Amino acid sequence: KRKIIKRMISSGILSVLMVFIIYFTLPYTMFSLYSLFEYATLVSLFLFLIVLLFRYFFLLLFAYLYLNEYTFKRDEGFYPFVSIIVPVYNEGKVIAESIASLLKLDYSNYEIIIVNDGSTDNTFEVAKELVGFQKGKYTDIKVSLINKPNGGKAKALNAGISYSKSELVLCMDGDSELSEETLKVAVRHFIDPAIGAVAGNVKVLNRKKLFTDLQALEYIEGLNIARAAQSYGRIVNIIP
């Protein structure tokens, strides 16, 4: 109810502000219906831009404050066992590369669990070839495969979590890759018992087109900066 009231108040204030702007600047515009509509549209876009600028400013401010004050204890002997769960659906063309990136991680105490969510291509056959102990950066890494009927990503993740016996779980998509330092950098935060989850920095690999550049910008603003700002107020409600 409070959220609804806040939205109503915000909408009301913006509407009143827009009306006042149009009213006081109306004498300087042409008195045709088309011109009035055009002017009202420009004013609306201007107000929207102002709101966005304030939003980005406060996001950057709170993200900076959080990153500036956040500290964690360092323990060079803290390397808990981690299960990396990879749910896949029709990822036959990329799953091998994704698993190859996981085998290069700068970490030794982990396993990889592939969950095939009823794929209709050759995903199961490709994943099956990866099962067993594969050579990692420091030691052999166990790769397991769960084959289940299609039920969606959530059920696939739950199947992997149920299979895992590790202290920590890392979930990633079948068409994604992790940088080598991911586990070492992420796991160190869990030495603080108050930490419940850690999100990574999502980056777009194939930034060759305008669309992918815009997608990368969306990740930076919508995930990285926004989550850091939310962390300052202890209001993060979803990972990532």
What does each of the following model-derived ranges do?
Residues 1-78:
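N-terminal membrane-anchoring/stem segments of glycan-assembly enzymes
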Residues 69-70, 91-104:
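Short, well-formed alpha-helical segments that are part of the catalytic scaffolds
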Residues 80-83, 111:
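Cell-envelope/extracellular polymer assembly enzymes that use nucleotide-activated donors
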Residues 88-96, 116, 120, 124, ...:
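A structural helix-start
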Residues 99-149:
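Acidic donor-binding segment of Leloir-type glycosyltransferases
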Residues 122, 126, 174-189:
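Acidic donor-binding/catalytic loop of UDP-sugar-dependent glycosyltransferases
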Residues 135, 139-140, 149, 154-156, ...:
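Long helical/loop segments within the catalytic core of UDP-sugar-dependent glycosyltransferases
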Residues 169:
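Short aromatic/hydrophobic "clamp" motif used to bind/position activated sugar donors
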